């Protein structure tokens, strides 16, 4: 699969030069802010994902460029900051010839990441928590509102830090602690 950036380079070439450059700079800045976000193509648009969740889509139109932060409530959270932009429930329009401002882009995408994190834990099923760079902080399963089954905890750089099992919310069996290079540092029995 081609990277989003190469797709974006090709995709945004269909627009006038300044418009394509503004879109490309915006998506590259989002990738810089969230280096662990996965590149994807969704609805025919360059997209950044965090796990199975969409962080943001990027697209150009005849009279504006748009960010689609994958949640209508993001626009509501930043009503004051977005007052100079045309905003609808699912999109934020910005000028054809200027990239979206980095400080505001960061605020919007961090808010979206917080929404993704807040969608967990579930009483039953998968739990995932993400760092602000888009990398996984921890992942496991819940059963009847308690941690149950295999769990993994990661460092900010994405390397595994600890893994083991929970049974009814209690650590169980062998837990392994890893050095940043992946080497096993110790094992603990519960």
Give residue spans per PLM region.
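Charge-dense, helix-prone N-terminal extensions
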Residues: 1-132, 180
């Amino acid at each position: 699969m081609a990277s989003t950036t190469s797709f974006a380079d090709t995709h945004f070439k269909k627009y006038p030069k300044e418009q394509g450059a503004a879109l490309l700079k915006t998506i590259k800045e989002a990738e810089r802010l969230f280096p662990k976000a996965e590149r994807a193509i969704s609805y025919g648009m360059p997209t950044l994902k965090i796990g199975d969740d969409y962080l943001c889509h990027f697209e150009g139109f005849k009279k504006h460029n748009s960010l689609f932060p994958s949640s209508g409530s993001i626009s509501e959270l930043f009503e004051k900051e977005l007052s100079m932009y045309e905003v609808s429930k699912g999109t934020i329009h910005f000028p054809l010839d200027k990239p979206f401002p980095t400080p505001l882009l960061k605020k919007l995408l961090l808010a979206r990441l917080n929404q993704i994190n807040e969608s967990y834990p579930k009483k039953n099923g998968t739990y995932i928590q993400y760092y602000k760079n888009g990398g996984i902080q921890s992942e496991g399963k819940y059963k009847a509102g308690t941690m149950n089954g295999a769990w993994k905890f990661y460092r900010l750089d994405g390397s595994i830090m600890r893994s083991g099992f929970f049974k009814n919310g209690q650590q169980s069996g062998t837990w392994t602690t890893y050095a940043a290079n992946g080497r096993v540092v110790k094992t603990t029995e519960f």
